[in-house]
Amino acid sequence: MGYILLKLLIIYIFIFSFLQADKPILVKNNCASVITVGVLTNGISSSFPELSFDLTPSASNSFSKPDSWGGRVWARYHCSGSAGKDAQNCGVPGAVNPASLAEFFFKGTGGKDFYDISLVDGYNMPLSISPSGGSKPDGYECGSPICSLSSCPPEYAVTDATGSVVSCMSACSKTGSPQDCCTGNYNTPETCKQNAQAADVKQRCPDAYSFAYDDQKSTYSCEANGYTITFC
């Protein structure tokens, strides 16, 4: 009897470990310059990413996260080495220093992963997300969102000390108004509508979130084994 119980325990541990296995995320740099990749888990308040690494052109690197992880991944130019200590230009993306985001929420409703490209705060470079090991792609089911948007209207441009454009604000990041940010009296899908800037971004980058309530045309789901994020 003891032998049988031991075998059952081993099987249980194996199955539990398999179900809780970490999920790999591969990041590729298709840009012409070095990029610095940042990773931050949802719920962590920090000025800097919890994980950061540089990628030279054509290089790639991978990291793994628990099967229940939720967080975001981004990349920036000119943030390697000591430059990365500049929180304003190289820290966690926000209204004043936006970046194109790859967002993930593993093991959500129905056991599926949910992922998207978010330009809600703004953007700074093209990117795409591709699942691996899931079912055959069908629209938002195991699809591969892509956004090649890179140009920025002058009125939304964020520039560095030399005047070079480093990222592009959204209308919400620029004005902070409840109407543009879907807050206050505009915090529901019924009251918050796409502003002109968000509509322009959505037209040029239809796979991505352009404002807070863009869920129906921006959220992808899949039971995947891992993901690849490609910048540029």
Residue map of PLM features:
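Extracellular low-complexity, O-glycosylation-prone Ser/Thr/Pro/Gly-rich "stalks"
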Residues: G2-C232
